[in-house]
Regions:
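Hydrophobic alpha-helical
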Residues: 1-46
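Structured segments of extracytoplasmic/periplasmic soluble domains
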Residues: 2, 23-27, 47, 51, ...
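A generic structural signal for alpha->beta connector loops
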Residues: 5, 32, 52-53, 94
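Electropositive phosphate-/nucleotide-binding environments in soluble metabolic enzymes
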Residues: 14, 59-62, 66
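Residues at the C-termini of beta-strands that transition into short coil/loop
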Residues: 39, 60, 101
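Short beta-strand elements at the ligand-binding edges of bilobed clamshell
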Residues: 50-62
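Hinge/cleft segment of the Venus flytrap/periplasmic-binding protein
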Residues: 63, 67-107
Length: 107
């Protein structure tokens, strides 16, 4: 209500996005406001398939798990500790966009 010209929401996770979409519907603006989430959970993919949410961004969850385990092993085995003042290592993890055009590939 305080931002009537709002065109889109990008949410940090799909649970938030599904709630935002519900609020958008309750405001009667589902044809005017785009909602995109993150995580590609089953309910969000169904929402995308049904033309409700515009998209969801999924990640390589196995890759995230492997990277976390490797860091944990390094911490235990080598005594590695994060130095808050040092530049932290970056691990890039693949992501993918699920839209109405490709949602069936991810269901």
């Amino acid at each position: 209500q305080s931002n009537p010209d709002l065109k889109a929401f990008y949410c940090a996770n799909d649970t938030m996005a599904l709630g935002v979409y519900e609020a958008v519907v309750n405001a009667g603006k589902q044809d005017q406001v785009m909602v995109v989430g993150t995580d590609a959970i089953a309910n969000a993919k169904e929402s995308v398939k049904n033309g409700e949410m515009a998209a969801t961004v999924g990640q390589d969850n196995v890759g995230i798990g492997v990277a976390c385990c490797e860091l944990a092993v390094k911490a235990v085995k080598d005594g590695w500790k994060a130095d808050p003042s040092a530049e932290m290592p970056v691990e890039y993890i693949d992501s993918f966009l699920v839209t109405k055009d490709n949602v069936d590939d991810y269901l």
